[in-house]
Amino acid sequence: PNSRVLVHKAPVYPTTLTTLNGLNVTLIEADFNDLEDIRKVMQEQDVDGAIVQYTRQKPDDSYEMQAVIDTIKACKDIPIITDDNYAAMKVSKIGVELGADLSAFSAFKLLGPEGVGILLGKAELIDEVERNNYSGGSKVQGWQAMELLRMLVYAPVALAIQAEENERIVHALNDGRIPEIKDAFLANAQSKVLLVEFREDIAEAVLEE
């Protein structure tokens, strides 16, 4: 509470912003696409911690998680929390594996129950969350815990099959399976999205069908 937290100069994810507002946190902005701007802000401002969102907050974002985390830590050894939501199990390393102190994401992103958060990181931070977790409404219930454990086994397989099928569809479309499609490719808009370009201006007609 009442801390000064470094964030990317972009719209903060709504649920994250609600939590920060509830803690009366002061947001200090830096452009994570520009490492020099991070250094400048860290030198000029008294920062208590940082939140780095793994997936892009703006279409032109290009920052690398490792570089941002390393730059912040080099300026001042403050706690860094990464919001790994849509990147969990879809990237080679999540935030805590790149040097952050805590990774946070929703169990729903692993095909688990909604409203359950997952934290990975330093024991003292997780212990503090546990101490402050209100047992009357915030504790994970037994059925939720069991559902999440099942999804930890199922999700890696399901997401891997999904990624494989995405690639297969792209190759099939680019090989001319559907003559009306000129080009197809995958975009990472938090979740993977298949985009196609038609040879003619027929997109509206396709949507109407």
Regions found by a protein language model. Name each.
Residues P1-L159, A163-D183:
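Conserved PLP-enzyme active-site core in the AAT-like
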Residues N188-E209:
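Conserved C-terminal alpha-helix-loop-beta "cap" of PLP-dependent enzymes
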